[in-house]
Amino acid sequence: MKAGIIGAMEQEVTLLRDKIENRQTLTLAGCEIYTGTLNGVDVALLKSGIGKVSAALGTTLLLELCKPDVVINTGSAGGLAATLKVGDIVVSDEVRYHDADVTAFGYEAGQMAGCPAAFKADEKLITAVEQCIHQLDLHAVRGLVVSGDAFINGAAPLAHIRNTFPQAIAVEMEATAIGHVCHQFGTPFVVVRAISDVADQQSHLSFDEFLAVAAKQSSLLVEKLLAHLAQG
């Protein structure tokens, strides 16, 4: 078993990177990949950079060069579900773009031409994540995570997302691109992120203040998940 782990920002990968044993670093095309072992699992940890293009590029490099069996996307997200607060966990059952629109040609909102309307996370990985959440006694919500190249910080964009994707539980900037590439490669994936803000007018202030909290929570869960995967 080899696990690929993806975070966009330094703060989202540093806690995991520091615990990788026999760590080696590969830098390519603006991405950094750290390989070694963590909690008994061979890992390749990617720091992709922010946004959909960086995430897609990095995920492609990760899958081509390291050939992981599964991909775990970690980091922070803006909460949309009413029950979520800072530090809570969101687990994807599927991911969609919130900023793709080819509805003029009969596609669903958020669906890219020639692609599925949503990219489905792997059910076995979801089950494993939920077992780890229960063991850690974390508050989590499972559902749709939406992605786009915008930090949601205001009433109008937030209302648009809520109206277009009323079932969405969280919003961020990379997960759907990661899911898209994993779909193309046939690699199972899951998104496991922690809430840093609630995507409102104060989200930029909340994000800066609580990113470390979100990174700690999501990294804790990823470590637990790796230990679970190591047991088979």
UniProtKB/Swiss-Prot annotation:
Active site: E12, D197
Reactions performed catalytically: S-adenosyl-L-homocysteine + H2O = S-(5-deoxy-D-ribos-5-yl)-L-homocysteine + adenine; S-methyl-5'-thioadenosine + H2O = 5-(methylsulfanyl)-D-ribose + adenine; 5'-deoxyadenosine + H2O = 5-deoxy-D-ribose + adenine
Sites where the protein binds substrate: G78, I152, M173, E174
GO cellular component, one term: cytosol
Pfam family for this entry, one: PNP_UDP_1
Gene3D superfamilies to which the protein is assigned, alphabetical: Nucleoside phosphorylase domain
EC number(s) recorded for this UniProt protein: 3.2.2.9
Alphabetized UniProt keyword annotations: Amino-acid biosynthesis, Hydrolase, Methionine biosynthesis
Top-tier EC class: hydrolase
Listed GO MF terms: adenosylhomocysteine nucleosidase activity; methylthioadenosine nucleosidase activity
SUPFAM superfamilies: Purine and uridine phosphorylases
Pathway: Amino-acid biosynthesis; L-methionine biosynthesis via salvage pathway; S-methyl-5-thio-alpha-D-ribose 1-phosphate from S-methyl-5'-thioadenosine (hydrolase route): step 1/2
GO biological process, one term: L-methionine salvage from S-adenosylmethionine
HAMAP family: Salvage_MtnN (MF_01684)
Annotated family: Belongs to the PNP/UDP phosphorylase family. MtnN subfamily.
Subunit structure: Homodimer.
Biological role: Catalyzes the irreversible cleavage of the glycosidic bond in both 5'-methylthioadenosine (MTA) and S-adenosylhomocysteine (SAH/AdoHcy) to adenine and the corresponding thioribose, 5'-methylthioribose and S-ribosylhomocysteine, respectively. Also cleaves 5'-deoxyadenosine, a toxic by-product of radical S-adenosylmethionine (SAM) enzymes, into 5-deoxyribose and adenine. Thus, is required for in vivo function of the radical SAM enzymes biotin synthase and lipoic acid synthase, that are inhibited by 5'-deoxyadenosine accumulation.
UniProt name for this protein: 5'-methylthioadenosine/S-adenosylhomocysteine nucleosidase
Gene field: mtnN
